[in-house]
Amino acid sequence: ANKIVIIPDHYIFTSDSLSNRNVDILREFAKAQGLQYFYDVIDDEGGKWKFDASQGLLKRQYGSRYAGVCHTALPQKGHLRPGEILFGTDSHTCMAGAFNQFATGIGNTDAGFVMGTGKLLIKVPETMHFRLEGELQPGVMAKDIILHAIGEIGFDGATYRAMQFDGPGAAGLSMDDRMTVANMAIEAGGKNGIFEYDDKTGAMVDERTKLNGTKSDYEPVERDSDETFVYDTTIDLGALEPTVACHPDPGQRKLAREMTGMKLDRAYIGSCTGGKTSDFLAFAEVVRGQEVCIDTFGVPATPEIVHDLQTTEWDGKSVWSILTDAGVRMTENAGCSACLGGPVDTFGRMNEGGQKCISATNRNFPGRMGSKESEVYLASPATVAASALAGHVADPREYLN
């Protein structure tokens, strides 16, 4: 039971009664099974979850145990350990590969089998090797690395394959950056994305397992000496530029500077991919002291990130205030929100057709963020910020002092 973690994060802050009921069903299941790690939306174990629309969408409506987006919460709560295997009922489970785990998404039937037997039959995937060299230039982010890679191989180019990232460039990336890259392996069809273990990995894992009292022993995995690759490439991080994945799939790559004529209706920053503290800090650096000119929505991935943004100060002003003063609609209700559309009252959802949104999220198939007639363009938090200021796709390098 201590190997099972249940984190409600989709369709939480909505008046949709069936969505609310799902949380109550989870609570009853976790109680019946004696599951220690259920991160409930409310504190009352005998209560019922009901979103109160009269309070609006911006004010916090969750209890002390709520964890937010599962993929971001798992490392924060000390549930990720190098060398282990993680199965999750969401395709972006591969984000945990940043921590030297074999992590992949599975369906509900497989999840039931895992919970009942502790086993699952999977094929060993072939490996695609991405050696990263150099370092990212100002205005270029980890999101640009993975958008570049997917643009090279296509949105099905890694189907049932492992995407392995290593080299000096990978070693130079922060854990947040590695999470962004590993997270989007699935957008190329990847079975998983994985990074090598190093001191950065160990430091975060050790800190978080100690803080949360979770299992702290682990054995990292290393490359086999005779490892072979079905694809082998080197990416010079210093040569990358701000990149956009265009509607209708993550493989439609263009450079931001090539798209500056394209007008936008809204901007969105959030999700497991683009809603981490470092993502919001990068966004705030661009918009600081200025004002966005299109509807811009901000959804931190977890309550911890909400706290970070409200307590981190720049020149005596919280980053949260810097963002709201710039016109960003920030919600304290951390979660998946409009990254995957959701019920019509979901914060940031595109309910009208014909709208174009630039987003720091991870997926842009038709209907992903709401209306099937809307279009989603994926970019880094910095590129989303610059574009929110400009009202059209913009290169963040022009906005950084």
Predicted features by range, described:
Residues 1-401:
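Fe-S-dependent hydro-lyases/dehydratases of central metabolism
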